[in-house]
Amino acid sequence: MKNIAIIGASGYTGAQITSLINAEMGLSIQGLYVSENSLDKGKALAELYPTYSHIHLCLSPLNDDAKAAIVEQADAVVLATDHVVSLHLAAWFYQQGLAVFDLSGAYRFEALDKYPKWYGFTHEYPQVLADAVYGLAEWNAEKIATSKMIAVPGCYPTASLTALKPLADLLTDVMPVINAVSGVTGAGRKAQLHTSFCEVSLTPYGVLGHRHQPEIATQLGQEVIFTPHLGNFKRGILATITVQLAQGTTAKDIEAAYQCYDNAPLVTVKQNQFPKVDDVVQTPNCLIGWKFDPETNYLVVTSAIDNLMKGAASQALQCIKIHFNELLK
């Protein structure tokens, strides 16, 4: 039995990972934590999320006593916290010898110089960063199994990279174009005017400046054009990706490239069939559909995930189970 502490458990992602870990044989929850200043401290998780009324745990403030208890009792920590908060907490718990699964962007880039531009802070822990592994579960399992500092990928990068990485050897120098739509939960639980019921509408945001663009490009090894959109639905991501493939590429070459997922139970790839967001909501799956035009060598790929599941919590659970050598269900 491995004990997992969850910090930031009051948010959508934190609550989701709590539910998943609570249901896992072989894993137990050491405690649920929020910041000392949180208005949710002391509340039961079920008070915030009646859906989780079967989870009889309260949200404790993360003070010094709580941190000491985590170090003594837990095998791993999940951080569902803000980037700057995770920056410091991840380094501290890692240095105490715990496995850290960080859902923020604080450890996703290897290069220190990317953090001031894309996250607005200077990274203070270069040695911890050097030890961090990018937790794209289907692609980095060996490193995830041996590292104690796992940077769980962002939601858009998970959808995009799962679709694109098998094609890396078939791409030309023409930048892939990624247009992706996310549900409102991707913006977090905090009340904001543009995500309120009467205001939310399909709209692009972060155009030519979203921090997930360099994350995708870094992991793919090629620059991309990425445009995220806010959709007027609760959860899910649908990415539509247009790429140019090398001259002479055939549909059979594409089929062969995607055979890398033949033994990946959570990824399904189909030719000429395209997923809907509803196909993946509340699941840990990634559904990919593609169609190829041999006359122009252009390929259109769609990738659908649940942003709170495969895009965050269930991928973190995958990483936890890989790290602790448990088989995926």
From Swiss-Prot:
Gene Ontology terms: biological process: L-arginine biosynthetic process
EC number: 1.2.1.38
Pfam families: Semialdhyde_dh (PF01118), Semialdhyde_dhC_1 (PF22698)
Catalytic activity: N-acetyl-L-glutamate 5-semialdehyde + phosphate + NADP(+) = N-acetyl-L-glutamyl 5-phosphate + NADPH + H(+)
Superkingdom of the source species: Bacteria
Root EC class: oxidoreductase
MF annotations from Gene Ontology: N-acetyl-gamma-glutamyl-phosphate reductase activity; NAD binding; NADP+ binding
Active site residues per record: 155
GO cellular component terms listed in the entry, alphabetical order: cytoplasm
Membrane-spanning parts: none
Pathway of action: Amino-acid biosynthesis; L-arginine biosynthesis; N(2)-acetyl-L-ornithine from L-glutamate: step 3/4
Keyword list, A-Z: Amino-acid biosynthesis, Arginine biosynthesis, Cytoplasm, NADP, Oxidoreductase
Subcellular location: Cytoplasm
Entry function: Catalyzes the NADPH-dependent reduction of N-acetyl-5-glutamyl phosphate to yield N-acetyl-L-glutamate 5-semialdehyde.
Family named by the database record: Belongs to the NAGSA dehydrogenase family. Type 1 subfamily.
Classification via NCBIfam families: argC
Protein name, per record: N-acetyl-gamma-glutamyl-phosphate reductase
Species this chain originates from: Shewanella piezotolerans (strain WP3 / JCM 13877)
GN (gene name): argC
